[in-house]
């Protein structure tokens, strides 16, 4: 170690470069490991997590399986009675309510749940009894934060709180900080408190009626989930026998049930009706892969500089061999030195992690702490990292060093055959990774920008939305008329669906014998309401039809009056019409109610992410709705928005629960995952470029120092600085050019797979690949030039005296 410390002092620059590279690589790797660990623990904190399942519905429509979060409301009782493996079953329904005491109400996320909910999903209580907290018909348990909001410092237990225009609840428990879960809420209330709206009072007309109820089950110890899953088809048939009158399908024939393991819901299961966006496995894979590549670049840097410096330790090796050192002893010595440096790098990495933590938290959108590194599988990982990194980075240089022959060393003829080729391969690999990450970053950013504007089927610019309007009191219709007369407002519409929202309502329609459709029943049509101004406000493109009967008023629609609807092209196709125009004038029947007549077909309108296929939508023309959309005039819209908000405040003084915003912002929210992936690639791609050039900087310095005398001779015989620069630049830019040939096909294939998830996507532009390669080349040239110009500009006399 004395020899090592002396060597490190003599080569401080390269030691610091190695230490910095290893510290950055290890810090990136451990930060990502922390994030992956945090994401992987969601829903694992329940007592019997491995026996908890969500029973979800599944609609089999046109050969496509549509997963639903919801299941038939009446499910829990029959399940526990007929499936012996199920130990307990419970339901909950997600809601967003105004909670408080008059006149102060606060918008909160709340679950309505069965009495045994806290015994199945055992969220811990700080105060109260989980067995009885929801057994009380008006019981509610709240988080500490909500209790402080509602009651200040007063004892919340036993106090009452009101759902505005709804139930009065009594606080029966205080929730402890819950384990990380796919459910997000501030309160859980007894479902019976809803009175006439409760499940018991809203008896399903059909077993297949699906409201918003979500069912969870806990299996008995030792029970097989496969046995339960295998029993579900027969269970469904007993309660919902196939209907021969619906041979083509129908809700009665297309519903099945499935089991979702609760610990898998957050990361692995996406279903219609998900309460909160889950985690994204793709993001974890991108992060993990990029972090490993960053660590690989750091290891390659160490290997490259260690082999390039090997000649400087050749004399030490020769002397050690002369005094009896064996090769395996030298390999162990030099590998141990690498492990020691990696250990120092790990210590430095922990300091870097602390500094970088706020930026990393913002990047991944989650609060993360260093404390988990000391427990679970992360502790052995953190301890093993310097050992693995040191061995991987130091073993090959140790072989090179220990392979020197004493005689050749003492004669000054020591060489390391093959080491230069290995260094070239590693440099190619480093820059290939950097170039690939740059191409991926640019393509992801182009794709996100593209899908936010292309193929929407409407014009999102200048659309302003006011959401969560109360319905049924007539204020929205009056407000609409007033807003339509504001300067700067071009059109106003009311609807029950806006971009980035989901109707969560799939309907089936019967078609009469004389229809122009090839089907007698259409399934899986997503239905929502919009008034007669909806399409003009959104700028939808009419494909066929479009005229409402003269004198017809949307306000007059009820169960006794005719109903009219507009279909999207996908809905018309789903209904069996070969041409959109064939659907116009057709009458569709559902649930025995008055028919709905199709008056028009519009181009597909995409309200969800471009990851989803075009939705088959039916727009029932009806007055009212909980969303108001305004098309504003172009230009400076701040004054108009202020005027709109003032008018809304006048009609709804308690507007703390209304949400305002532009449609562009809502669409941006659909692509948070993709945008985050792009930011991750940009951040780590930049890190990869810096690390690769850090290694190149060290290699260039070593090469320039080793060729100082050669450069001096070339200067004496007339070579200029530019000649020396060209000579050295070609040596180090050639691997970068080769790296392009390696990176391009690999990243093209990876991006092709990623882009295939989208129904609307950009082409992989050749210019993107060329730009990334050119940027890497320019950065490499600048890095090389720093050393070459310094050495080439020195006086030849000094260079010829260099040893």
Segments and roles (model prediction):
Residues 1-16, 272-276, 305-332, 336, ...:
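Alpha-helical transmembrane segments of integral membrane proteins
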Residues 8, 18, 39, 55, ...:
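Generic structural signal for small/hydrophobic residues in well-ordered secondary structure
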Residues 27, 31-34, 258-262, 338-406, ...:
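Small-residue-rich transmembrane alpha-helices
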């Amino acid at each position: 170690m004395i020899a090592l410390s002396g060597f490190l002092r003599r080569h401080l620059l390269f030691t610091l470069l190695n230490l910095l590279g290893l510290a950055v690589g290890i810090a990136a790797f451990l930060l990502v490991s922390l994030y992956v660990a945090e994401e992987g623990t969601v829903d694992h904190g329940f007592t019997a997590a491995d026996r908890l399942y969500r029973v979800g519905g599944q609609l089999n429509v046109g050969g496509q399986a549509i997963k639903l979060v919801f299941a038939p409301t009446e499910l829990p009782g029959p399940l526990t009675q007929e499936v012996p493996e199920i130990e307990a079953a419970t339901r909950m329904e997600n809601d967003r309510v105004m909670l408080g005491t008059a006149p102060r109400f606060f918008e909160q996320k709340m679950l309505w749940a069965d009495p045994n909910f806290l015994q199945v999903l055992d969220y811990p209580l700080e105060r109260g009894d989980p067995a009885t907290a929801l057994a009380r018909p008006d019981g509610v348990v709240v988080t500490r934060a909500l209790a402080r909001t509602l009651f200040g410092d007063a004892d919340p237990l036993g106090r009452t709180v009101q759902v505005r225009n709804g139930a009065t609840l009594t606080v029966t428990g205080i929730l402890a900080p819950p384990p990380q879960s796919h459910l997000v809420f501030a309160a859980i209330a007894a479902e019976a408190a809803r009175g006439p709206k409760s499940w018991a009072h809203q008896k399903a007309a059909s077993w297949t009626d699906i409201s918003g109820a979500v069912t969870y089950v806990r299996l008995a110890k030792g029970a097989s989930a496969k046995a339960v899953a295998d029993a579900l088809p027969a269970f469904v048939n007993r309660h919902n026998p196939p209907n021969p009158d619906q041979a083509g399908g129908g809700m009665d024939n297309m519903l099945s049930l499935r089991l979702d393991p609760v610990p898998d819901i957050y990361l692995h299961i996406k279903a219609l009706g998900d309460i909160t966006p889950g985690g994204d496995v793709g993001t974890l894979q991108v992060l993990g892969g990029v972090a490993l590549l960053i660590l690989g670049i750091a290891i390659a840097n160490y290997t490259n500089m260690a082999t390039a410096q090997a000649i400087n330790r050749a004399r030490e090796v020769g002397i050690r061999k002369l005094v009896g050192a064996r090769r395996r002893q030298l390999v162990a010595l030099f590998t141990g030195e690498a492990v020691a440096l990696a250990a120092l790098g790990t210590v430095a990495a922990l300091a870097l992690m602390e500094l970088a933590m706020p930026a990393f938290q913002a990047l991944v959108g989650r609060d993360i702490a260093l404390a988990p590194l000391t427990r679970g599988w992360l502790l052995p990982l953190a301890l093993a990292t310097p050992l693995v990194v040191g061995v991987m980075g130091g073993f090959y240089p140790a072989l090179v060093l220990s392979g020197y022959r004493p005689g050749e060393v003492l004669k000054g003829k020591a060489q390391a055959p093959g080491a230069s080729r290995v260094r070239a391969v590693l440099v190619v690999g480093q820059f290939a990774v950097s170039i690939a990450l740059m191409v991926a970053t640019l393509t992801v950013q182009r794709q996100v920008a593209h899908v936010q504007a292309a193929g929407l089927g409407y014009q999102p610019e200048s659309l302003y939305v006011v959401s969560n309007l109360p319905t049924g009191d007539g204020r929205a219709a009056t407000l609409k008329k007033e807003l339509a007369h504001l300067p700067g407002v071009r059109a106003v519409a009311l609807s029950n669906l806006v971009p980035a929202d989901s109707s969560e309502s799939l309907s089936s329609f019967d078609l009469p014998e004389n229809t122009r459709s090839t089907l007698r029943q259409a399934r899986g049509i997503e239905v929502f309401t919009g008034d007669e101004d909806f399409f003009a406000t959104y700028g939808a493109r009419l494909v066929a039809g479009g005229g409402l009967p003269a004198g017809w008023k949307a306000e007059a629609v009820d169960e006794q009056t005719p109903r009219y609807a507009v279909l999207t092209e996908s809905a018309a196709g789903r209904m069996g019409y070969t041409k959109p125009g064939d659907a116009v004038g057709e009458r569709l029947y559902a649930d025995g109610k008055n028919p709905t007549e199709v008056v028009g077909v519009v181009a597909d309108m995409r309200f969800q992410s471009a990851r989803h296929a075009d939705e088959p939508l039916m727009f029932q023309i009806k007055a009212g709705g909980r969303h108001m959309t305004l098309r504003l005039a172009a230009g400076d819209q701040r004054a108009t928005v202020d005027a709109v908000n003032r008018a809304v405040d006048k009609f709804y003084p308690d507007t703390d629960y209304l949400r305002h915003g532009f449609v562009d912002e809502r669409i941006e929210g659909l692509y948070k995952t993709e945008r985050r992936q792009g930011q991750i690639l940009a951040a780590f791609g930049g890190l990869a470029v810096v690390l690769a050039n850090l290694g190149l900087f060290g290699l260039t310095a070593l090469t320039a120092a080793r060729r100082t005398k050669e450069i001096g001779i070339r200067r004496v015989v007339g070579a200029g600085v530019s000649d020396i620069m060209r000579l050295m630049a070609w040596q180090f830019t050639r691997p970068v050019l080769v790296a392009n040939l390696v990176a391009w096909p690999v990243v093209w294939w990876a991006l092709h797979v990623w882009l295939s998830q989208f129904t609307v996507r950009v082409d992989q532009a050749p210019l993107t690949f060329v730009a990334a390669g050119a940027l890497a080349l320019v950065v490499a040239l600048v890095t090389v030039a720093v050393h070459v110009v310094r050495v080439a500009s020195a006086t030849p006399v000094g260079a010829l005296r260099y040893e």
